[in-house]
């Protein structure tokens, strides 16, 4: 197997008596785009800052391209970083901001001008060279910050929640642009975010973090469809959680309220009488009994919300509530609160949370 480009090995970080990152391990392949996803305070930015050299690990080591960089200063690591707050120099033009690192490195004026022009073309802002940061929108400023980070041709690109200060439409277009540029340059990238949609849409892999540890590392498909822990299942995507009791472990029978479903092969050592947390994504559930769905539960519609192209329906099943979306059809009246209703699903889509 090829050697990883970035290897974070058993890294721990403590501030006094408080440990914020605990035994964090991750290997990143050359050219890979990996997102650190998690809530505030989970340690994702601290790990990024240790890779950048702004924080020193309390234990463990960080290796880039086979070289131990754990104790190197930030300017010795050949790492580009983009901050949430842009951090552009207000007294410098766009071209001067992009070329700043090149000038510090002692590059010749003609080379700087050529590289700056190339960067402006890459971020599609060639006409902005002589403007100042205050004359730019937030999205344009973040593009300039990205261009400045990649202008020196770093080995590794680090992005610390670069889109969180932007409005929704700009965030979507800019994240796609960042991914496109990253693919074009082939630069190994770590992207920190608390936004699951961002992470799912642009990452090769995602490290979901909680309490200073990596709860799960996997592709977006794996993280969403095969969550390893209850935290990952709840944090990524919308989830319906049902409490059930194992009635027959050998045959995989579980009782939800007073109704039974079969989860053969999914109980993982659970015994008859055990209580389980079961979960279904809304898109895995249909209203009414549907062909091809091997499981169903009966309940009563408790809420109906018209959302335009879809109608969000909540169905009470004993002490559980299940949320699902059904397409809006002008020819079919929406379901009504208080109606009895069946929901159907495939048992293969049911998650057992641990």
Identify the function of each model-found stretch.
Residues 60-68:
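Conserved ABC transporter NBD signature motif
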Residues 52:
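Helix-to-loop junction immediately C-terminal to a conserved catalytic motif
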Residues 37-39:
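The feature captures the beta-strand-to-loop junction immediately N-terminal to the Walker
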Residues 33, 72-231:
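ABC ATPase nucleotide-binding domains
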Residues 239, 249-354:
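Non-catalytic connector elements of ABC transporters
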Residues 58-61, 111, 211, 243:
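Conserved coupling/switch loops of ABC nucleotide-binding domains, chiefly the family-specific signature
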């Amino acid at each position: 197997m090829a050697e990883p480009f970035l290897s974070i090995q058993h890294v721990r970080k403590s501030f006094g008596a408080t440990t914020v990152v605990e035994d964090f391990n991750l290997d990143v392949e050359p050219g890979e785009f990996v997102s650190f996803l998690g809530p505030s305070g989970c340690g994702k930015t601290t790990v990024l800052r240790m890779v950048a050299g702004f924080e020193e690990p309390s234990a463990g080591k960080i290796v880039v391209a086979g070289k131990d960089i754990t104790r190197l200063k930030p300017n010795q690591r050949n790492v580009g970083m983009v901050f949430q707050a842009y951090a552009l120099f207000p007294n410098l033009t766009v071209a001067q901001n992009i070329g700043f690192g090149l000038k510090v490195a002692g590059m010749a004026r003609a080379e700087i001008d050529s590289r700056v022009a190339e960067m402006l073309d890459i971020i599609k802002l060639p006409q902005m060279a002589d403007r100042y940061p205050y004359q730019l929108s937030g999205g344009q400023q973040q593009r300039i910050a990205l261009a400045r980070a990649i202008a020196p041709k770093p080995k590794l690109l680090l992005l610390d929640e670069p889109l969180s200060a932007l409005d929704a439409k700009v965030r979507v277009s800019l994240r796609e642009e960042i991914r496109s540029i990253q693919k074009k340059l082939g630069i190994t990238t770590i992207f920190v975010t608390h936004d699951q949609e961002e992470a799912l849409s642009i990452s090769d892999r995602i490290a979901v973090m909680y309490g200073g540890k990596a709860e799960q590392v996997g592709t977006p498909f794996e993280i969403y469809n095969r969550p390893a822990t209850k935290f990952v299942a709840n944090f990524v995507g919308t989830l319906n959680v049902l409490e059930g009791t194992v009635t027959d472990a050998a045959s995989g029978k579980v009782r939800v309220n007073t109704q039974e479903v079969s989860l053969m092969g999914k109980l993982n050592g659970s015994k008859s009488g055990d209580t389980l947390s079961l979960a279904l994504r809304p898109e895995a559930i249909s209203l009414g009994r549907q062909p091809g769905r091997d499981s169903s539960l009966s309940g009563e519609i408790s809420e109906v919300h018209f959302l335009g192209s879809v109608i969000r329906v909540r169905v009470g099943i004993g002490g559980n509530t299940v949320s699902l979306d059904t397409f809006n059809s002008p020819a079919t009246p929406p379901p009504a609160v208080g109606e009895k209703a069946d929901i159907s699903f495939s048992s293969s889509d049911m998650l057992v949370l641990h």
